[in-house]
Structures are given as C-alpha cells and as structure tokens.
C-alpha cells in the first residue's frame, strides 16, 4: 500500500494520532513539573519532547499535505483505463 495514499485517503487518523501524541506530551510534562522537590526525570522529559515534536510534525504535515493536494495538483489523466479496455485495437 502506498504510504502517501494512506494519508490522502485517511487524514483523520493522522490528525487523531497527532492529538494523542500531544496529550501524551502534556501528561509527561505535567508529571515532570509536579515533582518540584525531586530532580527531573530525564526519561519523562525525553518522552515529552519527542511526543511534542512528532505531534507537531504530523499535524503540520497533514495540513500542508492536504493544502498541497487541494491547490497544487494538476489534472492527471489516468491512462490505465485506456490500456485495459477490450475494444482497443493495436495497429
């Protein structure tokens, strides 16, 4: 399956995954910041940062990708329908 076809056909899955990653980043940041007296846990900090960056990349990517597909694609002729028709004569 074409990965770009997945984004083109189901962009809502990517948006939901990006929102879930943002929620995970917020939860990890809250847990890290609630430990005021203890030293910061580097694992929670790295999970929070990585989740936030991936979520922002996914959400911005799907916004830019959908905008590109809407405004920048030209008319593409599907030539496969002509090649497979039974009435085509080869001369």
UniProtKB/Swiss-Prot annotation:
Q: Show which residues constitute the signal peptide.
A: none
**This protein's UniProt keywords:** Disulfide bond, Membrane, Phosphoprotein, Transmembrane, Transmembrane helix, Viral envelope protein, Virion
Q: Which residues lie on this side of the membrane: Intravirion?
A: 1-12, 68-91
Q: Name one GO cellular component term.
A: viral envelope
Q: How does the UniProt record describe the way this protein sits in the membrane?
A: Multi-pass membrane protein
Q: Which residues lie on this side of the membrane: Virion surface?
A: 34-46
Q: What top-level branch of life does the organism fall under? A: Viruses
Tell me where in or outside the cell this protein is found.
Virion membrane
Q: Can you tell me where the transmembrane regions are?
A: 13-33, 47-67
Q: Tell me the protein's name.
A: Virion membrane protein A14 homolog
Say which species the protein is native to: Fowlpox virus (strain NVSL)
